[in-house]
Amino acid sequence: MSAAPRTALVDLGLGNLHSVARSLGAAGADVVHLAEPAALKGFDRIVVPGQGAFRDGAAALEAGWRAPLLEALHGSTPLLGICIGMQLLFAESEEAPEARGLGFMPGRVRRFPRDLGRDPKTGAPLKVPHMGWNQLRTASSLLGEGAYYYFVHSYFCDLEAAPGSDAPGDTVTDSTRHPACAAVAHHGMAFCAALAQGPLLAVQFHPEKSHQAGARLLRRFLLAEAEAV
C-alpha cells in the first residue's frame, strides 16, 4: 500500500483517543476520528481503542455502534481492537454481567483471581489490576516473539471451546491453546494477550503506551495484507 492507509479511529467515548491517534499517525496512518457509526465505510484500516469499563463500551454499542462494527468484523478490512476494544468482541464480562458485547468471539471476559501468588523475580504479591510491562509468547510476526508491551487491566478474555472440540474442560478451553489466541502473557497465570482471526487483530495491551514495540506493531498492522493480520 503506497499511500498512507486511511484509518478509522472509532470513538466509543472510552478515552485515550489522542494518544492512539498520535501513535497511528507516527506509524504512517491517515487517521480519521470517527464519532458517527454510519460513517464506518470505505476505510483501509479500522482501529477500536478503549480504556475503562466494559459497561461503558457496551453502552456505546447500544447507542449505534453494534451493527456497523459487526458488519466490519464480518468484512475484509483489517481491524485492530485495543484493550476494551478486544474485550467488547465477546458477549459478556464478569465486570458487568448485564451488559452485552458484540458476541463475535466465543467465550467471555473474566476477572483475574484475587490470589495470583507472588512475582517470581521480586517475591512481592501479584496485584490486580495487572499493570506494567509484560512479555509475549507468540508465533505472530506482527506481535514479535519475546516483545514487551504495556498492560493495564483487571479482566482477561477467556475463549470458549467450539462444540465437539477436544479442548480440555467442559465448556471453556485453555485460552492460551485456542486457535484464535495469537499471543500469551503471564500474570500469576497464563492468559491470552492477543487474538487473531482473518483480518482481525485484538490486543489486551496498549500499543500506544508500549514505546518501540508498540510503534513497530502499529507499522506492521498498517502495512500488512489483510490475510496476514
PLM feature segments, named:
Residues 14, 50-52:
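Short glycine-/small-residue-rich Rossmann-like dinucleotide-binding loops
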Residues 40-50:
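Short acidic/histidine-rich motifs immediately flanking catalytic phosphotransfer sites
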Residues 52-128:
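Cysteine-nucleophile active-site neighborhood
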Residues 108-229:
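Amide-donor transfer/coupling interface in amidating biosynthetic enzymes
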